[in-house]
Amino acid sequence: TSSFLVPRDTKGLTVARCNETLGCRFMNNGELVFEDMFVPDDHLLVEGTALAKAGVYFQPGKIIQAAKNLGVGVRCLEVTSDYVQNYMQGGRILIKHQAVALRLAEMATRIEAVRALLERASEAVDEGAADADALCNMVKYYASEEIMKVATHAAELHGGNGMMLDFGVEKLFRDAAIFPHMDGTVDISKFKIVKALYPATAGKYAGRED
């Protein structure tokens, strides 16, 4: 595969439409159409090995997505902690209810587990470690699933207010729902983890089964 630089004003390149997303609306998601488009030779960036070279950027990309996701989780815990320590129900603040307190403990633990794995994966990428690819995919999928649980607890602990625009929790919930699908799905990350851990039997160049 080869890669080319295509300026936005290139004849034959059009943006068919831009899609709105459930969450993470800071992104621009557009459908590109290439029709009878001429790209000059001097716009060639990488010849023959573009996909392999692009893979170098997949690792930090997953780190960045996991870090954004962690930020969503941290904010979920912040706003929920404030809410349950001030909102009264049945004559008591919410945090005095055992079920509420247990959910807070789960949220905090999940956030710290994601943070620890994110730090380890980041160090592996910086050091060029052999297990960097596996760790990047681990933190991508783990953060996606765990922070979604954190956001769900945040919405639940706000009760009906969790679905109200004024409280902001619904936005965090929508953002958390996007991350499992960014930079590859969770299942794709799991496949990559297995291939990295067991290259001889599950990897791209594994031998044929007899």
Describe each model-derived feature in a short phrase.
Residues 96, 100, 133-141, 162-178:
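Charge-rich, acidic-biased intrinsically disordered regions
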